[in-house]
């Protein structure tokens, strides 16, 4: 790409901010970002933990090791992905994580014609196994899969989940932007279609009824609905995530409810 993908612009936000927010919604748990030492990052939510990878050039297993060590003892399952997946959907993250059970150590999508080790779920305890592989110079994820229990999910198996089939029927969650042309093509596509609703004072001010808008963040949804998203307004995503953070990413099918905070709804 020629530049860090983390800070690439994405519909008024950045690729990393979007990825962090989508993963957080899909796992309902802590989020860890692994970066090169000193790598500048775009603004992230305060509860996101940033860990430095002090051993660059060892490939994806090294990054996995750092992230899994951070979550070992904190989470039972970790969804691990790259930052360059602009169409990643919360339903995809949830589908992969929820497929993990006591019989497996890894849930590996084998979809869109490829294994997807950077869109997969791992047991954090695998960090020690990965360290052994790195020490032996075995740097490919395939070496890890050879020594642990892997549940492989095909396209059909992934889409057996109704929520994912409805939200992302072609599994575009797995699309990467590896080249400048990929990024330009992705940027040219419209933002996700979401529903916007207003209640309380906002509804009485001429914004009554649900409407469909194109928006990748809460702020852009408010703008599309001709609302001023300031400290007087709160937003709820799908009725359960209440926030004043306008950078919160949205995905196709979301419903955003805006309420006047001063009026208490």
Question: What residues fall within each predicted segment?
Answer:
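Ubiquitin-like/PB1-type beta-grasp interaction modules and other compact soluble beta-rich domains
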Residues: 184-264
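Generic structural signal for individual residues within well-ordered alpha-helical segments
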Residues: 94, 128, 142, 183-184, ...
């Amino acid at each position: 790409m020629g530049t860090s993908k983390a800070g690439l612009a994405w519909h008024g936000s950045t690729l990393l901010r979007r990825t962090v927010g989508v993963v957080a919604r899909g796992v309902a748990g802590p989020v860890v970002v692994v970066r090169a030492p000193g790598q500048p990052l775009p603004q992230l939510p305060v509860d996101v933990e940033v860990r430095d990878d002090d051993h660059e050039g060892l490939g994806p297993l090294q990054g996995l090791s750092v992230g899994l060590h951070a979550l070992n003892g904190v989470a039972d399952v970790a969804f691990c992905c790259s930052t360059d997946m602009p169409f990643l959907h919360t339903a995809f993250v949830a589908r992969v994580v929820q497929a993990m059970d006591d019989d497996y150590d890894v849930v590996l999508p084998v979809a869109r014609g490829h294994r997807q080790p950077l869109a997969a779920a791992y047991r954090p305890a695998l960090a020690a196994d990965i360290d052994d592989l790195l020490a032996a110079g075995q740097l490919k994820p395939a070496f890890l899969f050879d020594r642990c229990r892997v549940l492989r999910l095909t396209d059909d198996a992934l889409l057996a989940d109704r929520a994912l089939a409805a939200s992302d029927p072609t599994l575009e969650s797995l699309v990467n932007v590896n080249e400048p042309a990929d990024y330009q093509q992705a940027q040219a596509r419209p933002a996700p279609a979401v529903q916007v609703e207003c209640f309380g004072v906002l509804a009485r001010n001429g914004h009554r009824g649900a409407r469909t808008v194109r928006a990748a963040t809460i702020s852009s949804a408010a703008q599309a609905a001709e609302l001023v998203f300031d400290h007087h307004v709160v937003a709820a995503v799908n009725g359960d995530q209440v926030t004043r953070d306008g950078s919160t990413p949205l995905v196709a099918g979301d419903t955003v409810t805006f309420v006047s905070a001063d009026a208490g709804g």
